């Protein structure tokens, strides 16, 4: 191999991988860090890479692209995996993989590498993305190749090679954490026992509902063509809007979930997720659709959503079938305009109002107090008789 582009976070795993690649492949390693809202100090990451004699370091701000082209399209589908997971990690991998391949082409690299473990979903997501963007690229997955089979052995390797091992609040190696503008996930350590209650001091974006404000907060989110564009009438870019919702939702204990999910490779895993802004957006988007989308179309969306979510979770973002579903989902997005009013209180998101110039809601038809024009109560009798025919025993 001539040159390798490593997806580099500056954390323990990828710092060890960087050193390991240099030792075992005897070629230049380019590092690429995508700033997608993880709130890491990018200058520290650059210094870490430079300290390991890396000559080409790419640190790129991709927050707007991430939210605009990946998060928002996913939320147009009201996407949720297995009832709880808003796919915060899953949706970040396609963008990182795409840009990693672009950097490989730019620098003349013939291989890419990632830090995903051999037990997880991310190895699949990264590599599906690589092969969709460049079928001939060589892929190095150190966790499937080296003899460092546990986090303990990884830490020992790091210490022997003078690689800094970050410590958490109790002076121990931290949880396995993945963060971006959409969410933060925590895995490993005591969480590997699904019956043990989490130590919520781990949270960095949110207060727990018990510690959240005792005063409800009302906000309004404005939608245009299916995407949020403003909070309380203040226009915001996609990344800034999600950032603001994270701040607002975090102080009210919104979007903290403890789940056991089914990984694509067949293993069950437990994680704690913080998704304050995304949780608010999911409720708001469903609310604007409830008045702008007709019944059968809404039900169809609910039927295809699990398939769409499964495709993203399993790493199939770039596939034809995902793009086909996206086209179907986006077909009527021009109608999804309006404003949703939401109350936030101690972990709960309550939609308290919605309005749209494209609303299909009719007060005259829905009201018990008005004489409905165009609807005769007597018509319901025939409707019931016809639709009950199959229920009657012969």
Swiss-Prot record:
It comes from Ehrlichia ruminantium (strain Gardel). L-citrulline binds at residues 85, 90, 121, 125, 176, 185, 261, 273. Pathway: Amino-acid biosynthesis; L-arginine biosynthesis; L-arginine from L-ornithine and carbamoyl phosphate: step 2/3. Keywords: Amino-acid biosynthesis, Arginine biosynthesis, ATP-binding, Cytoplasm, Ligase, Nucleotide-binding. The keyword Cytoplasm applies. One of its GO terms (biological process) is urea cycle. GO terms for molecular function: argininosuccinate synthase activity; ATP binding. This is Argininosuccinate synthase. Belongs to the argininosuccinate synthase family. Type 1 subfamily. L-aspartate binds at residues 117, 121-122. Homotetramer. InterPro entries: Arginosuc_syn_C, Arginosuc_syn_N, Arginosuc_synth, Arginosuc_synth_CS, Arginosuc_synth_type_1_subfam, AS_cat/multimer_dom_body, Rossmann-like_a/b/a_fold. Pfam families: Arginosuc_syn_C, Arginosuc_synth. It comes from the Bacteria. Its EC number is 6.3.4.5. It is found in: Cytoplasm. It catalyses: L-citrulline + L-aspartate + ATP = 2-(N(omega)-L-arginino)succinate + AMP + diphosphate + H(+). Coiled coil: none annotated. ATP binds at residues 7-15, 34, 115. One of its GO terms (cellular component) is cytoplasm. It is an enzyme of class 6 (ligase).
């Amino acid at each position: 191999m001539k040159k390798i582009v490593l997806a580099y976070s500056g954390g323990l795993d990828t710092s060890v991988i960087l050193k390991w690649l240099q030792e075992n492949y005897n070629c230049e390693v380019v590092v690429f860090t995508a700033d997608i809202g993880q709130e890491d100090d990018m200058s520290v990451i650059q210094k870490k890479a430079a300290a390991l004699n890396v000559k080409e370091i790419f640190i790129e701000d991709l927050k707007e692209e991430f939210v605009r082209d990946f998060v928002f399209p996913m939320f147009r589908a009201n996407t949720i995996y297995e009832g709880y997971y808003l796919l915060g990690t899953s949706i970040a991998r396609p963008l990182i993989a795409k840009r990693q391949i672009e950097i490989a082409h730019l620098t003349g690299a013939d291989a890419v590498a990632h830090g995903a473990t051999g037990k997880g979903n991310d190895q699949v997501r990264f590599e599906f993305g690589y092969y969709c963007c460049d079928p001939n690229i060589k892929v190095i997955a150190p966790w499937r190749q080296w003899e460092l089979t546990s986090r303990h052995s990884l830490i020992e390797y790091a210490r022997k090679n003078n690689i800094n091992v970050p410590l958490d609040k109790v002076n121990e190696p931290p949880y396995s954490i993945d963060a971006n503008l959409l969410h933060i996930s925590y895995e490993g350590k005591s969480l590997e026992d699904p019956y043990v209650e989490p130590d919520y001091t781990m949270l960095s974006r949110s207060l727990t509902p018990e510690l959240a404000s005792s005063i409800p907060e009302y906000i309004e989110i404005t939608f245009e063509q299916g995407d949020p564009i403003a909070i309380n009438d203040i226009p915001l870019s996609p990344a800034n809007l999600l950032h603001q919702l994270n701040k607002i939702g975090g102080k009210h204990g919104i979007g903290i979930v403890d789940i056991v999910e089914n990984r694509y490779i067949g293993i069950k895993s437990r994680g704690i997720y913080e998704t304050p802004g995304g949780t608010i957006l999911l409720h708001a988007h469903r609310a604007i659709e409830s008045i702008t989308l007709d019944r059968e179309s809404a039900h169809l969306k609910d039927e295809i959503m699990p398939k769409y979510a499964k495709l993203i979770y399993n790493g199939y973002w770039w596939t034809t079938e995902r793009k086909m579903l996206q086209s179907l989902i986006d077909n009527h997005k021009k109608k999804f305009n309006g404003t949703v009013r939401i109350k936030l209180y101690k972990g709960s998101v309550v939609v308290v109002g919605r309005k749209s110039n494209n609303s299909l809601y009719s007060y005259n038809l829905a009201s018990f107090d008005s004489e409905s024009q165009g609807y005769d109560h007597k018509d319901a009798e025939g409707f019931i008789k016809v639709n009950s025919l199959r229920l009657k025993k012969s």
